[in-house]
Every structure is written in C-alpha cells, then in structure tokens.
Curated annotation (Swiss-Prot):
UDP-N-acetyl-alpha-D-glucosamine binds at residues 8-11, 22, 73, 78-79, 140, 155, 170, 227, 332, 350, 365, 376. InterPro entries: Bifunctional_GlmU (IPR005882), GlmU-like (IPR050065), GlmU_C_LbH (IPR038009), Hexapep (IPR001451), NTP_transferase_dom (IPR005835), Nucleotide-diphossugar_trans (IPR029044), Trimer_LpxA-like_sf (IPR011004). This is Bifunctional protein GlmU. Disulfide bonds: none annotated. It comes from Clostridium kluyveri (strain ATCC 8527 / DSM 555 / NBRC 12016 / NCIMB 10680 / K1). Mg(2+) binds at residues 103, 227. The lineage of its organism: Bacteria, Bacillati, Bacillota, Clostridia, Eubacteriales. GO terms for biological process: cell morphogenesis; cell wall organization; lipid A biosynthetic process; peptidoglycan biosynthetic process; regulation of cell shape; UDP-N-acetylglucosamine biosynthetic process. GO terms for molecular function: glucosamine-1-phosphate N-acetyltransferase activity; magnesium ion binding; UDP-N-acetylglucosamine diphosphorylase activity.
C-alpha cells in the first residue's frame, strides 16, 4: 500500500531561547528535523512533506538535500491546522499518511514499520503511538471505552479530573487513512482551552463515523519531545547511549561509554579501542584496530586501519594505515597523511600531503606542502607558506632530511635525497642529492666575556 509522511516543523520553540528554529538544534551532530527525516526514510517512507512556518528558509536550507516537499503554516493555530496546511500534498493520494513531529528525534525505524503494519493489518482509520508513564503531566491522555477501544484523545489542559488520572499518553505520532483524514480535518473546531485546532480531535471524529482506532504502545523514550535545552540534553544522552551500544555490539571497545561522544552515521571498524573523552563528528570513517587515547576530536575524516591517535585534533583529513598522531597534534582540513607516518607532539599540518614512512616528530608546522615518502623533519621546522597576501606551495621530495630549526620559505622546492642543515632558512630550490646550508658561520670572540667585565 502507498504510504507517505508529514513532519510538523513549524513550531518556534520559545522555551529553547534561541534565534534558530527548534528543529535545527542538533542531537549527536545532526539537526533534529534531519534525524526524523532520515529515520522515516529508513522505514521505507520516501514521500515526505515538511510543514514549516517562521524561519522557513532556514529549515528548507538545512533539509534541502533530503528531497522533501514543503507546506507553509503562516500562523501557529495548532497541529490540526498544521496538517491542514499540507492538504495540497495529500491531494489525490490514496493509502496511509504517517504524521510525526520534527522535535521528536528518538523514534526508531522498527517502531515506524510496526506502526504501518499494525495500521494496515487492523484496517484502522487511524493509529496512535502511545506510551504508559507514571507522570503524565502535560501530555494528552488516551481515553478508552469500557471494552478498551480508543474513544478519543484529550489534551492535558482540557482533561476532566478523572481523565487526569489516566497514565496512557499520546506520543503525537500517528498514521491515518488519507481519505478519512482529509474529510475529518474540515470538521475540527478550536473550542478548547488553547483556542487551537487539534489533530487529536480527528480521532474522536473518526470514531463517531464508525472508523476503527488503533493504539500501539511504545517505550516512553521514543515519544520524547524536545522543547527546552534540558530536554535536548536528555534526548542527546539517550541517543548517544544507543549509538555507543551499537558500536560496542559491532566489536568496538569503549573504555568508558558514558564519556565517549560519537555522532550519528559515524563508521568504526572492529577491534578499535576508544578511551574516554574522545569526540567523533560529522561523517568520520574509522578503520579496524585503531587506538584513540583520551581527549581527541576527529571531525569528518577518514582514519585507516591500525592508526593511533593521542590527545589530538583531526579535521576533514585522511590518515593512512599504521600511522601515529600526537600527542597534541593538529591536523587541519584537506590534509592527507600516508602510511606508517609519525606525526608527533605539537605538530600542525594544514592542507598538505605527507608521504609514506615520513617522520614529523615534534614542534613543526607544515602548511600548503607536498611532502614525499621517507622524509624526516627535525624539531622546530616551519614551512613559511604565507607572505601576507597569498599562501604559497612547498614541494619536498622523497628521502629528504630537514634539520632542526629550519625555515622553508614558500614557494620553494626541495628535491629527492637532500639534506638541509639545522638552523637554515631555505629560499631557493635545493637540487637532488645536495646539502643545503643557509646560515651565517659561527664566530668565536675569545675572552669577550672577561673583557666586558661580565664575569670574573
């Protein structure tokens, strides 16, 4: 049967106290609205409409790669009005429409699939995802008849005293027969405490028309909506625990899973060991048998097999097999580091290529450079790539030995099999096989200290 989805994302989220729309706040590295869109797509719902309102352009920009359509809700008149604004999306469609909220990012793929199967198998006009909670304050209540069939949903502010005692709550997520939903939307009224058009009223309307109403209980954490920074932190903690559990089940060792921060969609190979304090962001891919000692940040990078990283930052770069990075290294965007390379303490590499088996052991800056294989950089080497206006290129050939405290003033080329003497400032090309010395000769002035009377 055909199915589609509407995601409600027009709410302003005033309790977030933010200048950006609520649904654009991130959970584990991804905007909440995109988390919801992605999980809906994984549940095999491809036709998705997002209802947007104030700041609509920001939401559209954040979701434009998701191939969704959009409806606009100009005034915040309730969830029923929001779905009504998507009428053009539903026009001439037959089948099932699922309705989700863009601020409920914890719903699971299997739950959505189960809801669709449950709805279709039961022949329901509407199906509600519900949950049983001990403290239902603030949630709409599921009111059932004596035979346990769903009668209606009553919003918290409209509940009678006995209805307030009900523990089964509405998650705000549903699926409907499309034709039944369209007919019912025109019948809802705003005669309630909020003066809004509730989507929940559709349930009672369908019931009165003889339609069957289904209710599928799910774990409460999946129903959690995010309306404040506190709830955002709570949702992120739940999602982070899910992510970490999946990686551990797939063969990754997390020494302290409560203090390891892995974004959604990160890939990590088996037998990798991760110590606490590490942060993995963006679309990072990590190979097998890697070790991440405490307190590194890896963002949108590819880390190949058998890499060791210690207390370092790697941004939008690629690290080859059997390489070690850190401690206190800084790998900046557009860097490619080869196999069996050593990037040591207080080394910064920016927009450069480092060949296989090269050693950059400590206190070095390499920027806008192409470095060959089997090179060695002495302590204090600086690639001087910026002249105040432009960034210039440095080329360093294979098997080059760069002595300590060397400046390579770009643009400059150092050919294969060369040596550069410590303390040199290199401004000209170094021929293959040459030793370059670019420093003043040492002068010793005998007895100078005593003649000056500095010491007796």
């Amino acid at each position: 049967m055909y199915n589609c989805a509407i995601i409600l994302a027009a709410g302003e989220g005033k309790r977030m106290k933010s200048s950006k729309p609520k649904v654009l706040h991130k959970i584990c590295g991804k905007e909440m609205i995109n988390v919801v869109i992605d999980v809906v797509k994984k549940a095999q719902i491809k036709d998705i409409n997002v209802v947007i309102g104030k700041n609509s352009e920001k939401v559209k920009k954040a979701t434009e790669v998701k191939n969704t359509s959009y409806s606009f809700q100009d005034k915040q008149l309730g969830t029923g009005h929001a779905v009504l604004c998507a009428s053009d999306f539903l026009k001439n469609k037959r089948g099932i429409v699922a309705v989700f909220t863009g601020d409920s990012p914890l719903i699971k793929e299997n739950t959505i699939k189960n809801m669709l199967d449950f709805h279709e198998a039961g022949g329901y006009g509407a199906t509600i995802l519900t949950s049983i909670v001990q403290n239902p304050f603030g949630y709409g209540r599921i009111i059932r008849e004596e035979d346990e069939q769903v009668l209606k949903i009553v919003e918290h502010k409209d509940c009678l005293q006995e209805e307030l005692q009900v523990k089964e709550i509405n998650s705000g997520m549903y699926c409907f027969d499309i034709e039944s939903l369209i007919e019912s939307l025109g019948k809802i009224r705003n005669n309630n405490a909020q003066g809004e058009y509730y989507l929940t009223d559709v349930i009672e309307i369908l019931k009165q028309e003889g339609k069957k109403i289904g209710a599928l209980p799910i774990p409460f954490e999946e129903t959690m909506g995010v309306n404040s920074r506190v709830q955002l932190a709570e949702a992120e903690k739940i999602m982070r625990n899910r992510i970490n559990k999946i990686h551990m089940e797939n063969g990754v060792t997390l020494i302290d899973h409560n203090n390891t921060y892995i974004d959604l969609d990160i890939q990590i190979g088996k037998d990798t060991i991760i110590y606490p304090g590490n942060v993995f962001q963006g679309d990072t891919v990590i190979g097998e048998n890697c070790i991440f000692y405490p307190n590194s940040r890896i963002q949108s990078s590819v880390i190949k097999d058998n890499v060791t990283v210690e207390n370092s930052v790697v941004l939008e770069s690629t690290i080859g097999e059997n390489t070690s990075v850190g401690p206190f290294a800084y790998i900046r965007p557009e860097t490619t580091i080869g196999k069996s390379v050593k990037i040591g303490d207080f080394v910064e590499v920016k927009k450069s290529t480092i060949g296989d088996n090269t050693k950059v052991s400590h206190l070095t800056y390499i920027g806008d450079a192409e470095v060959g294989s089997k090179c060695n950089f002495g302590c204090g080497t600086v690639v001087v790539n910026y002249n105040g206006k432009n960034k210039n290129k440095t080329l360093i050939g294979n098997n080059s030995f760069i002595g300590c405290n060397t400046n390579l003033v770009s643009p400059v080329k150092v050919n294969d099999n060369t040596y550069i003497a410590a303390g040199s400032t290199i401004t000209d090309e170094v021929p293959e096989g040459a030793l370059a010395i670019a420093r003043a000769r040492q002068v010793n002035k005998k007895s100078w200290v005593y003649k000056k009377g500095l010491k007796k």
